[in-house]
UniProtKB/Swiss-Prot annotation:
Role this protein plays: Catalyzes the conversion of dihydroorotate to orotate with quinone as electron acceptor.
An annotated GO BP: 'de novo' pyrimidine nucleobase biosynthetic process
Name recorded for this polypeptide: Dihydroorotate dehydrogenase (quinone)
EC identifiers of the protein: 1.3.5.2
Gene3D superfamilies: Aldolase class I
GO terms under cellular component: cytoplasm; plasma membrane
Reaction catalysis annotation: (S)-dihydroorotate + a quinone = orotate + a quinol
Cofactor(s) this protein requires: FMN
Lineage: Bacteria, Pseudomonadati, Pseudomonadota, Gammaproteobacteria, Pasteurellales
Family: Belongs to the dihydroorotate dehydrogenase family. Type 2 subfamily.
Membrane topology note: Peripheral membrane protein
Main location: membrane
Record-linked PANTHER family: DIHYDROOROTATE DEHYDROGENASE (QUINONE), MITOCHONDRIAL (PTHR48109:SF4), DIHYDROOROTATE DEHYDROGENASE (QUINONE), MITOCHONDRIAL-RELATED (PTHR48109)
Amino acid sequence: MLYPLIRKGIFALEPETAHNLAIKALHIAGNPWLNRALKALLGCPQGTEKTVMGIKFKNPIGLAAGADKNGEAIDGFGAMGFGFIEVGTVTPLAQDGNAKPRQFRIVEAEGIINRNGFNNYGIDHLIENVNKSHYDGTLGINIGKNKITPIEQGKDDYIFCLNKAYNYAHYITVNISSPNTPDLRTLQYGDALDDLLKSIKERQKILAEQYNKYVPIALKIAPDLTEAELVQIADTVRRHQMDGVIATNTTISRDTVQGMKNAAEIGGLSGKPLQHKSTEIIRRLHRELKGDIPIIGSGGIDGVQNAQEKIAAGAELLQIYSGLIYHGPALVKTLVQTIK
């Protein structure tokens, strides 16, 4: 009920400034006493348990990567009632990302454009924060490559992060679909994807033996794929027996926001304008995967109806982020109460 007033204050600030303040506030809310108080205030129920990728999720509603890049606010976000939280995207080395301003709201469409460029403090810093958290849900770590790493050696960055994250994550996501790191999306296609997934699965096997536990690995894909590209990706992830696919990342398309303020800004578009595009990718991907590999649906979820559309299209779990900015923690509660 209070959120419309809070949102007014948030939206008076630059998007990145508002985001940084929110992360600081949620970091403070990680204090055990404050955390209990926030949980009581928000009153989110436990939700319905669901087992996906061999993991028991306390409910199927998760926080998408990008919200908490460095794992600074895991417990604060946890108090909202999320069944799982995905931190990152994180890279081997700290990097500043692209020049500011790099986040833009499209308020009339409830959309956000970002061209952040994987700004983060590096994998070691993230792992330190993960170690300090007390969150009782499922934790995913989303990994990427540094901008300075040539795309031909991108695989090395993913393996480096995989080695570091393996013992601290319930699952790991390989992000090859951000539009804001030059050439990154080329890793989604043909031999490049085949080679990357082969190396990742080989390393996963070694790490599973080393730590005596199996940590599932999901692939995060873009919404801007042709039918042929999607068929090829589906074939490759099945062949390499990936544990999950997250569909989707942000879009470079502007079809749904043409003529609106900030719509011409370069970057990935998320939020409501991505809603139908991501659901359609889920539907097509589900058809290709034939239920063999679970899909985590993400992109424009802002209410029960479109959340259920993604489940009906084939998603087993859901992730939100932009919807949280526009609708506040009440959205988490509504989805947790409703989505089974």
